[in-house]
Amino acid sequence: APARGENTDIPGIVVAFAERGVTELRGTAQVLGAGETAASAAIAAQRLGAECVEVYARRPERARALAERLGADVTAHALADWRVGREVALVVDTVPRGYSPEEHLLGDLGDTALLSAAYDPWPTPLAERWLAAEAPVVTGLDMLLHQAVYQVRLFGGAPIDEPVPNEPAVLERMRAALA
């Protein structure tokens, strides 16, 4: 039989945002980084309804390659050009150890949600700013927790969209193990 795989990052990101009250996006999603977690985050943002996704990377050619791979409504930019604007609904930081921009680049965060995928060190520089502004923050561990739930489903032989028996209890035990 041909090999088959599932991406558990995408639904894990979507559910982690939902847990923080972010279930639908209106506006732009910005993804910092151009690796595989960034690709999953961009797709998750599209599934949440982002009107467009902007990918920012230290090497703009990597951002362009990712944007081309993901297709319509994804644009590529240099990380040095990143700014949070009023139209931004969501920022996902996949830069290893977290991105640390100049303070003036952030402006008023309002209700802009952040997923800071790095979990060590915590909080990341961006997460510190978001937490201080009392804006929604999803941690890298939140993402990994929900990704793991989808993996448990698959490892048990169930379809990815079919909860396992007692899944809320499984989730709480997994969460307790992370504490």
Model regions and ranges:
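Adenosine-phosphate binding glycine-rich loop
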Residues: 117-179
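Glycine/small-residue-rich loop that forms an oxyanion/phosphate-binding "nest" at active or ligand-binding sites
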Residues: 1-27
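Rossmann-like adenosine-cofactor binding region
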Residues: 71-138
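Glycine-rich Rossmann-fold phosphate-binding loop(s) that bind the pyrophosphate
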Residues: 33-35
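NAD(P)-binding Rossmann-fold cofactor-contacting core
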Residues: 48-70
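Short, conserved loop/helix-junction motifs that constitute active-site signature segments
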Residues: 24-25, 47-49, 105-112
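N-terminal Rossmann-fold NAD(P) dinucleotide-binding loop
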Residues: 38-39, 123
